[in-house]
Amino acid sequence: MHSNSSSGSRLCLNSLFSSLPLKALALSTMLFPFHSINAGKTLQYNTVVNTNTLTVVAVESPTTVFKEDQFLHGFGYDLARNYAQSLNVKLDFKIVADNATALRWVQQGKANFAMTTAGLSTIENKGLMSFSASCGDTVDLQKNGLNPELSWVFKQADDPLTQTASGFVCQSKQNGVTQQLASFYNRNVVKPEAWSTIQRDLTTRLPIYKASFKQSAAKYDLDWHLLAAIGYQESYLKPESVSPTGVRGLMMLTNSTARAMGVSNRSDPAQSIQGGAKYYDQMLSEYDDIPFPDRNWYALVAYNMGPGAVNQIQKRLQAQGKDPNQWVNLYNYLQSNKTRNGRYKQAVQYVTRIRAYLEHIKTAQTRINI
């Protein structure tokens, strides 16, 4: 829950410094030595405190944010969202057409900071300052196909907001959050050479089942593109698919799940899609207390592994003193234990590929004629 008082927000901002690891805090203060605050300056820190809102501006890109319909996610977005949560304030995330506009918003005070890939000279020429959004962790960004030049850009170096943000991104690097977010938003999760086959499959098969996807999505207030992405991951949109374990149909339902969802013929595409939509809706309901976009990722893992398996992991996370409702914690657990548990490895592949397929379907609709 967000604090509605300035004092509550101010406490979170101030206490962040005291909770930072010494190394991260030292780096923050080394980069931005704390000067005595000029009372005449308009500090972004004060704006955030007074409005209880952190306003961030960015240009849509594979590294910063994906925004289509109700979907809003991405490496940069999630990092900014985590920062806002650490300050106990709301995040107001704005998307503009280009880096020049994003930098201008910071200059004009329309945004507290910008996430941008603008060059350092461009930023400095506008009288702004910046630091690496990954605290210099360019290796993890590069190996996951993300732009290592992503920066957070602020109006003033001696603003407390700038200094807490610098400490936060270095703390995120130190505790592994940066690495896990980069891994989840890996642009290479689907091999580049595979996209031509995927494009051909979607062009050929998706139009056949589009009406069923849309009808079932409307019934359960879901996004039909997401259902289609699940279907492609499950069966490549082949209704006759069957696995060695007995799951069958376009949405690859087990016998017990099919019966529970009212599906009498798993090989019937319309029935399978309806059953898959109903089951996914039930998985979303399991995690009503988790905000989007994280709720989608939890529901997808539960669709793949079963909600009982997810709930067991949540209990283990809680026992470790970690927030069980933070996607980065669940994802890290799956990643860290996938070598000893094949189901965890499968779940990681499942959710990351569906995310990639979803983004592709939404941004390639005109090219694949759906």
Annotate each predicted stretch with a short phrase.
Residues L222-K238, I273-A277, A299-N304, I354:
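Short, functionally critical alpha-helical segments immediately adjacent to catalytic or ligand/cofactor-binding
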Residues F154, A299-A364:
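Catalytic and substrate-binding regions of cell-wall glycan-acting enzymes that process beta-1,4-linked
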Residues I37-A118:
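Extracytoplasmic small-molecule ligand-binding "clamshell" domains
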Residues E240-S264, Q271-Q282, N325-Y331:
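Substrate-binding/active-site groove segments that recognize
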Residues G74-S86, L146-Y185, P207, Y357-A364:
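Extended ligand-binding regions for polar small-molecule ligands
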Residues S166-T204, L317-A319, R367-N369:
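Ligand-binding clefts/hinges and TM-proximal coupling segments of bilobed small-molecule sensing domains
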Residues A58-P62, G127-Q163, Y333-S336:
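Periplasmic-binding protein-like
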Residues L20, N186-Y236, A270, Y287:
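Export/targeting segments at the very N-terminus of extracytoplasmic proteins
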